[in-house]
Amino acid sequence: MAKFKRKYTLGEEIFNSVSHGIGAGLSIAGTVVLIVTAAIHTNAWGVVSSCIYGASLIILYTMSTLYHSFTNEKVKAFFRIMDHNTIFLLIAGTYTPITLYYLNGVTGWILFGIVWASAIFGIVMNSINLEKARIPSIFCYIGMGWVIVFAIKPLMEHMPSISGIFLIIGGIFYTVGIIFYAIKKVKYFHSIWHLFTVAGSVFHYFAILLGFFRI
């Protein structure tokens, strides 16, 4: 495992751990609401995909919180890899209800396969050499996040317009946030990235949740 070099001040790490700790708590509560709503208003695909999506939210925010909370060098290095890997997990997790419930059919399954295969590839890439994978990972995040544009027409036939709007806004928050994520040298930029991540997650969560109420 590569030696970890501390990059953030104590103040930054407190902000980073607290912000995503709150995100973890909200993810747990939100997942319960989502699954119950799916059980009432959707079918088996809605419930299963909600479980997968909710789990990806909880895991990402938990891993990020742990990474920014620990000070032990070896422990922090391990959770840094986990933190980066769960970004791929969340992207694929978010796509799961979109592809399996809203899109469904051939288009949904093809997109599901592409996104999850990309996520697995990214996780393996990060696990082998996180430093060398950092820049390629950023491009993978963006590519995976916006591949939905190729299926936007059939998606909007099965998703209410408000959900589509929230989906786009969430994607914009994530994408703009990557700018702050990529620039490591400026103090508190990573913390700003955390805020953009939470905002993106909130919009995507409600995009999926509100769509479940469509009759």
Regions from the PLM with identified roles:
Residues 1-215:
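Multi-pass alpha-helical transmembrane bundles in non-GPCR membrane proteins
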